[in-house]
């Protein structure tokens, strides 16, 4: 004998209720999926944290081997420069409109691609262009582990005048 199920069909109200619950569940999953990645703790690297750049002897040897070419540290957004009398860390942000300033080996200076400002390779002072002042400098210190650059953009050395001032050197040759 075959038994029939008395409620085998779904009426319109049950179908709408199931569809509404399914849509709410799907929307909740999408919202949760977009929020969860922001809740993960990430290791902080780059701009805003101290960056160890090696020993002073290694940095000076790299300058000597490359004819004092600046050393780029991409993760910290800065260049190490062999300034007259010491080592400084120049922030790569142009003082005109904030573009990232690359090193041009062909011109032997920093050349901003946005509005053609040019900066000296040793002191980061403006050589030519619309930039109003030299590149900002990060604080640099000598520790037992080597040279450490503080890449906090809120604690930069802002030089208001377009000339080299030896007082900004924190690590001497």
Q: What residues fall within each predicted segment?
A:
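N-terminal secretory signal peptides and thylakoid transit peptides that target proteins
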Residues: 2-26
């Amino acid at each position: 004998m075959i038994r029939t199920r008395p409620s085998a069909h779904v009426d319109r109200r049950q179908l709408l209720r199931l569809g509404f619950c399914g849509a709410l569940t799907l929307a909740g999953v999408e919202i949760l999926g977009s929020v969860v990645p922001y809740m993960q703790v990430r290791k902080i690297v780059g701009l805003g944290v101290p960056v160890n750049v090696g020993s002073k002897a290694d940095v000076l040897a790299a300058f000597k081997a490359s004819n004092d070419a600046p050393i780029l540290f991409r993760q910290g957004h800065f260049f190490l420069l062999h300034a007259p009398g010491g080592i400084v860390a120049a922030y790569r942000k142009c003082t005109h409109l904030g573009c990232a300033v690359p090193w041009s080996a062909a011109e032997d200076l920093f050349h901003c691609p946005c509005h053609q400002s040019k900066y000296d390779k040793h002191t980061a002072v403006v050589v030519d262009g619309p930039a109003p002042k030299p590149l900002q400098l990060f604080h640099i210190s000598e520790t037992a582990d080597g040279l450490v650059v503080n890449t906090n953009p809120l604690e930069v050395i802002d030089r208001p005048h377009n000339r080299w001032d030896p007082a900004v050197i924190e690590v001497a040759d």
